[in-house]
Amino acid sequence: MSKPGRTILASKVAETFNTEIINNVEEYKKTHNGQGPLLVGFLANNDPAAKMYATWTQKTSESMGFRYDLRVIEDKDFLEEAIIQANGDDSVNGIMVYFPVFGNAQDQYLQQVVCKEKDVEGLNHVYYQNLYHNVRYLDKENRLKSILPCTPLAIVKILEFLKIYNNLLPEGNRLYGKKCIVINRSEIVGRPLAALLANDGATVYSVDVNNIQKFTRGESLKLNKHHVEDLGEYSEDLLKKCSLDSDVVITGVPSENYKFPTEYIKEGAVCINFACTKNFSDDVKEKASLYVPMTGKVTIAMLLRNMLRLVRNVELSKEK
């Protein structure tokens, strides 16, 4: 590239949603004695990243008119009971849990303990099923919008902000012709992100330590939802081939030692890092046209947006 690429801060993207969120909270307050919706966060670990996320969530939500209650659970064995109690508390509008807690399948179980009506993170199995099947509503009348997991949704919104989505195409096909690579296939972010992008029309290379897969909706988007094809076991050669074919490189490797090779980046590509550590080297902008080093502030904006959507869904359900 003739000149270095630009850095796009997450705060700049998040700002585009702030006015909408604040206005909706103010409307809510008019019918709820001047009080904003209540978000309850559960912290049952000593993870510094989780504590930082909790601090960011509280600061951002309260600045926008929400009420926020961080409940620290000293004995993690009592977390499930605390979540169930919040599920049944009509004063609570949204619930989130700062993971990891147990760091195993028990965490996946806890994700399902949060009732879907209050699941601001979009981790409930109903929401995941809708995501993977490209279903965008909870009801046949298309009134109750399904909830998407916060970080994958944040990355979609970043791509929209960067005009990677083509608004001239029909909704649901606006990534047609784009190729993306996602270096992470976790059940929380990587896999659902690959599915979301493919369901919107992209060809997505999904990378983990074992293999590389391709997510697409088939030739000319003939399929209603994404299809997964195994490309082979992980190798540097296959990674390089897929990456150099990609217009967008998205990384989420939770390791300070990991750096995505700059020489694998296609000239003019867009690079986005959603890990809490830097996954790209300092020379990334020698190849990338646009570089987003962190996504956290957009993730929190999507969490609050999800919460307002849940509040709206509850209100619409009562009208039936």
Swiss-Prot record:
Its EC number is 1.5.1.15. One of its GO terms (cellular component) is cytosol. It holds the Pfam family THF_DHG_CYH_C. It catalyses: (6R)-5,10-methylene-5,6,7,8-tetrahydrofolate + NAD(+) = (6R)-5,10-methenyltetrahydrofolate + NADH. Keywords: Cytoplasm, NAD, Nucleus, One-carbon metabolism, Oxidoreductase, Purine biosynthesis. It is found in: Cytoplasm; Nucleus. One of its GO terms (molecular function) is methylenetetrahydrofolate dehydrogenase (NADP+) activity. The active site is at 150. CDD domains: NAD_bind_m-THF_DH. NAD(+) binds at residues 185-186, 208-209, 274-276. It comes from the Eukaryota. GO terms for biological process: folic acid-containing compound biosynthetic process; one-carbon metabolic process; purine nucleobase biosynthetic process; purine nucleotide biosynthetic process. Gene3D superfamilies: Leucine Dehydrogenase, chain A, domain 1, NAD(P)-binding Rossmann-like Domain. InterPro entries: Aminoacid_DH-like_N_sf, m-THF_DH_NAD-bd, NAD(P)-bd_dom_sf, THF_DH/CycHdrlase, THF_DH/CycHdrlase_cat_dom, THF_DH/CycHdrlase_NAD-bd_dom. The N-terminus is blocked. Catalyzes oxidation of cytoplasmic one-carbon units for purine biosynthesis. Homodimer. Belongs to the tetrahydrofolate dehydrogenase/cyclohydrolase family. Present with 16200 molecules/cell in log phase SD medium. This is Methylenetetrahydrofolate dehydrogenase [NAD(+)]. The gene is MTD1.
